[in-house]
Amino acid sequence: MKTYNTDEIKNIALLGSKGSGKTTLAEAMLLECGVIKRRGTIEAKNTVCDYFPVEKEYGYSVFSTVFNCEFNGKKLNVIDCTGADDFVGNAYTALGVCDTGVIVLDAEYGVEVGTRNIFRTTEQLRKPVLFALNQIDGEKADYDNLMEQMREVFGPKVVAVQFPVQAETQRSEERRVGKECRSR
């Protein structure tokens, strides 16, 4: 087993409302880091993090699960936290040992009550937060409205560091249609 210096270890909590995509993000991370060869899905009941029978039965995380992987020479210790309100204590506990929180938002539902509560906790614990937007290609997702909502709820410090491809495509299409309407 490789030995890491403390500055090479990052402890991250995946946070968010139930069904926002935390476990799906965990699967993508494990795949990208080469820990698994095939990404599991909630529907197939074969994810690394949801292995208890009750989680497979319910289709969502009941317990927080720890996994680790190496990325760019850094060891990532990640806690996939449950988003169910009944088990939110697991998320609070995870934040106590993590350096950073990654709050996953389902773009179709926007900022949910559970997301607000988790964000408040990260502020109280003075933990830096990164937002990951999931389901951005969903039928009801509106990237621009979601960003506006996030700035209203979480403050003006919310900044996009990556833009979804379809958001630019959507804006380009809106500009094209607008030009056509004006030229008539």
Where are these regions (language model features)?
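P-loop NTPase switch module centered on the Walker A-proximal segment
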Residues: M1-L105, V111, A160
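P-loop NTPase catalytic nucleotide-binding module
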Residues: M1-S20, R38-R39, D106-R176, S183-R184
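Cysteine-centered loop/knuckle micro-motif
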Residues: L25, G178-C181
